[in-house]
From Swiss-Prot:
ATP binds at G695, P696, P697, G698, T699, G700, K701, T702. Gene3D superfamilies: 1.10.8.60, P-loop containing nucleotide triphosphate hydrolases. It catalyses: ATP + H2O = ADP + phosphate + H(+). This is Peroxisomal ATPase pex6. Its main location: cytoplasm. Interacts with PEX1; forming the PEX1-PEX6 AAA ATPase complex, which is composed of a heterohexamer formed by a trimer of PEX1-PEX6 dimers. It is an enzyme of class 3 (hydrolase).
Length: 948
């Protein structure tokens, strides 16, 4: 939206019962190119990066140029408004909630709204009796004559009082008395809230500020119950409770130990009618707080350049205050001096503390200007980093390995604990499972800077170069009183022999461990955290140093749900969509993929609405609503882009399988119930985890397993028995473990063992010298038992075999393959016709063909594979017939055209269309014989009776 033309205006509050804006059209025409009276819709926001409002403003030529009057929208009463033209999206559907009042006729309500081409927004009140519940396809658009309305009547709005502004409170006007309130802590503290532009803000409801005679942007004072005062700059925030305020996190901490001035539950205070004393700062002294970023010469140089310029642009500061400067590390490392480039797309932060402000102790709060002298002290500050509350912290608290790390770090960084013990944690797991995210989130909570080094940086380095690099790294670490030393990718340091064993004695490892030992001083609090993909590849020298090993697996459903709640917080999802259903569809997705999923969904929604004729800007400003279709498109797009997919879901539906209705019902009941109603199994009831499909070959066992995965949106892994076997001792069992481990990580998942009898025969009967088959069966039994005990991992195992009598009997005991489903031959004509319909649904059949009649002519012993062969032969027969017809046409034309040239010239003619006729099927039937004889079928029936 960078090309959208905007103009700035000063907003003024207007006491009016309506929700509207007034502006001088004459001024707006001059100030805003593209503004026309006949289409006078405009978009207003206090900041181009946050959502605003669409208005059809009322013309008031008496208003001063550059001003806008606003009523009913306190969140727009800021220092300035950005105004731009917009073509609002027309609403297709609106659902209203109306208080049940007989005097309000439903049709009259709709006509009144349609008649004035109202602009509606989800969760807005049209008046005290009507709430806009749902809008489609955007949350903020214009009504026209074609908009469909649905009205739901209710007895009352119990929440009306807290949502609607009471205009009588504004009419009381300015008072000179203090206002009682509660200071609420913010749920999230991110680096952006600590920037210079935000570090002194106090977020106040408009009516509270108005009633003490203050304006947005003016200095205010809060007096706490213990007599202390907090000073800051008023910032109107409409979603704040009417009797509470929120402080910028920078205003919480003013002492060396970062003790917050407010409690977690909230602190009672007064908004003092008399404001604080304010003066110009003649000189400000700043020190950097030790973090890894500040030890980068180029990053620090770029940050110092930015902080000098930003401080000179009138910011409000107090002594002992902390703030940060965001920096684009790529631009900083390229020695750029362009402030705009350095502060755009930032990914690094340099923290500063205000040491002194001159004139000393003269004012409560100071503001800066171009004449303010800024001193950047080269000595590091003794202050600790502030405690951040990043959005992912809620996820950390429900993610078991992150939760353990959080608990250990809380105990270690407790100031009441005596320092001296420096633990070593080893985090291991597949890539993109959240190891780095967990460390960053936990560290931010405990004010501990993270000093990161990757093993790739010194894997091939010489001993001298490595020692020099690590010496500098350690020197920077010890400058901070507490820190986390984060060593990534430790398995890079391992050296393997030809037999696959880890060779000890790597020089790099010895140097690394010796340097880490230098950090472990009795005075400091330092935690060492290492990461790796596989703990089996870690040298024993490192394993002997680690105190705790935490395994990071693929995200489970409830963990993905918590992440989606965080990442999807800033997008608009259709209220009919459950995030739990979305989480079910995102199995095996990583942190990064879930983080970018909301952006993909928004793009899909914009693309969908854009096809109706609106431009990108209008759609985005109107708030596109994400539908289920957008969710599916986005998930499929991410899966296609994913290069390391573990398993894929096959595209086989129930409709693709003819017959087998009994088997379908059993599988649906067995597998679908624990997925849809997990609460049924929360009281100790164990869901069935194993199903064995047995019967003659060609009856659809593999196809049925694929359909289960597709219909229930499960990951699917198909294992042919011999694939697991390996010539080396222990490798076959390891292969079995790996299959189940990956399935657990990708739950809900289906493991399909085809030809199960080839890897799980009777134990004791194998002729191999190492008893490999017996060990594989034992490992398989252990894995089946483990998944049946874990209610939180939805892993279903489906086995398929022609000979269940050859299987080890232990596999068929309760808790393993305890449900046996026989897939026999569909002898009924109705079942065979159903199979034919499923197999030929993509064919172009002759209009006169009757599949029921074809089914009558089929042999009773035809299996599903035989029916597939019948259809394939019928297609080949049709192709031969059509080829002969074309040859005759070429001969009749008297030309020397080849068959290919003839097709090119006549490709659009209906006469070339290939249609399957009854004769094609009958020709194929004459040649086809059942693949299973009567004797074999009799033997399978005996096996069925044995296991039924």
């Amino acid at each position: 939206m960078e090309n959208r033309i905007c103009t700035l205006a000063k907003p003024l509050p207007k006491l009016d019962e309506s929700k509207q804006a007034w502006v001088s059209y004459l001024w707006l025409k001059k100030a805003l190119p593209g503004f026309e009276e006949h289409s006078a819709y405009v978009y207003m926001t206090t900041n181009p990066t946050i959502a605003g409002r669409i208005f059809l403003p009322i013309n008031n030529e008496d208003l001063e140029d550059g001003t806008v009057e606003i009523s009913g929208y306190d969140n727009l009463l800021a220092d300035a408004l950005y105004i731009s033209t917009i073509a609002p999206v027309k609403l297709d559907f609106v659902q209203l909630i109306v208080i049940d009042d007989n005097s309000q006729d439903q049709d009259a309500i709709i006509e009144r709204i349609k008649g004035r081409n109202a602009i509606l927004m989800e969760s807005d009140f049209i008046n005290q009796n009507i709430l806009v519940q749902v809008c489609q396809p955007v949350r903020h658009g214009v009504v026209d004559s074609e908009t469909k309305f649905v009205i739901e009547r209710k007895d009352s709005f119990t929440f009306l009082a807290s949502n609607e502004k009471n205009i009588s409170s504004f009419k009381r006007g300015k008072t000179e008395t203090d206002a009682e309130l509660v200071i609420r802590p913010s749920k999230v503290h991110t680096e952006i809230q600590w920037c210079l532009q935000n570090c002194s803000l106090i977020h106040v409801p408009f009516e509270l500020l108005f009633n003490v005679g203050k304006k947005n942007g003016c200095p205010i004072s809060l007096r706490l119950s213990d007599g202390k005062n907090v000073y800051g700059i008023a910032s109107i925030k409409s979603d704040t409770e009417h009797d509470s305020v929120q402080l910028s996190p920078s205003l919480h901490y003013f002492d060396e130990f970062n003790e917050s001035v407010i409690s977690e539950e909230g602190t009672e205070a007064f908004l003092v009618a008399r404001g604080p004393s304010v003066g110009i700062a003649s000189r400000i002294s700043l020190r950097t707080i030790p973090t890894q970023s500040c030890f980068s010469e180029k990053l620090l140089k770029a940050a110092n350049l930015c902080v000098v310029q930003q401080v000179k642009q009138k910011v409000f500061l107090q002594s002992k205050q902390i703030f940060c400067v965001p920096i684009n590390s790529l631009m900083a490392n390229s020695d750029s001096v362009d402030i705009l480039e350095l502060t755009r797309n930032t990914d690094a932060y340099i923290w500063y503390s205000v040491e002194e402000i001159d004139p000393l102790n003269t004012y409560n709060i100071y503001y800066t200007n171009e004449d303010t002298s800024i001193v950047l002290d080269t000595q590091l500050s003794h202050r600790l980093l502030p405690s951040l509350r990043k959005p992912l912290l809620n996820f950390v608290k429900v993610h078991p390995p992150s939760q353990k790390l959080l608990r250990f770090c809380r105990a270690f960084f407790d100031p009441q604990q005596v320092p001296g013990f420096n633990p070593f944690f080893l985090l291991h797991g597949n890539p993109f499972t959240g190891k780095t995210k967990a460390v960053e989130e936990v560290a931010s909570l405990f004010s501990a800077p993270v000093f990161t080094i990757s093993s790739y940086e010194f894997a091939d380095a010489t001993a001298d170069h490595l020692e020099a690099k690590l010496d500098m790294f350690v020197q920077n670490v010890v400058k901070s009183p507490c820190a986390i030393i984060f060593v990534k990718d430790l398995d890079v340091l391992s050296i393997s022999s030809d037999e696959g064993n880890i060779v000890p004695g790597s020089k790099s490892i010895q140097i690394l461990l010796s340097k880490i030992d230098l950090v472990k001083s009795p005075q400091g609090r330092y935690i060492v955290i290492g990461t790796c993909h596989s703990i089996e590849k870690i040298p024993y020298e490192i394993l002997s140093e680690s105190f705790f090993e935490l395994k990071f697996s693929e995200l489970e459903m409830d963990e993905r749900l918590e992440l989606l709640k965080i990442y999807a917080n800033n997008v608009i999802i259709d209220k009919r969509i459950s995030l739990k259903d979305v989480a079910l569809k995102t199995n095996s997705m990583s942190f990064g993929e879930l983080e970018c999923l909301p952006d993909h969904m928004t793009k899909a929604a914009v693309d969908r609405i854009k096809r109706t004729g609106y431009d990108n800007d209008s759609i985005i400003l109107s708030g596109p609503i994400i539908t289920e279709q957008d969710v599916d498109v986005s998930i499929n797009r991410i899966r296609k882009e994913k290069s390391n997919t573990i398993f894929t879901v096959p595209k086989v539906n129930w409709d693709d399988i003819g017959g087998l209705e009994e088997a379908k019902t059993v599988l649906r009941d067995t597998l679908q119930l624990p997925l849809q109603f997990p609460e049924l199994f929360s009281q100790g009831l164990k869901p069935r985890s194993g199903v064995l499909l047995y019967g003659p070959p060609g009856t659809g066992k593999t196809l049925l397993a694929k359909a289960v995965a597709t219909e229930l949106s499960l990951e699917f892994v198909s294992i042919k028995g011999p694939e697991l076997l390996n010539m080396y001792v222990g490798e076959s069992e390891a292969n079995v473990r790996n299959v189940f481990e990956k399935a657990r990580n990708s739950s809900p998942c289906v493991i399909f063992f085809d030809e199960l009898d080839s890897i799980a025969p009777h134990r004791g009967n194998s002729s191999d010298s190492g008893n490999v088959m017996d060990r594989v069966v034992s490992q398989l039994l252990a894995e089946l038992d483990s998944i049946s005990k874990d209610n939180n991992k939805y892993v279903f195992v489906i086995g398929a075999t022609n000979r269940p009598d050859l299987l080890d009997p232990s596999l068929l005991r309760p808790g393993r393959f305890d449900k046996l489903v026989y897939l026999g031959i569909n002898k009924s004509e109705e079942s065979k016709a159903s199979m034919l319909r499923a197999l030929t649904k993509t064919f172009k059949l002759d209009e006169t063909i009757d599949l029921n009649e074809i089914a009558k002519n089929c042999h009773p012993n035809f299996t599903g594979a035989d029916m597939y062969a019948l259809c394939s032969d019928a297609v080949l027969s049709a192709i031969k017939r059509k080829t002969n017809e074309i040859d005759l046409l070429i001969q009749a034309s008297g030309t020397d055209l080849s068959t290919e040239e003839f097709f090119k010239r006549n490709e659009n003619q209906d006469s070339l269309e290939l249609r399957i006729t009854k004769e094609d099927f009958l020709t194929s039937l004459k040649k086809l014989r059942p693949s299973i004889s009567e004797q074999e079928l009799h033997r399978y029936e005996m096996v069925r009776h044995q296991f039924s």
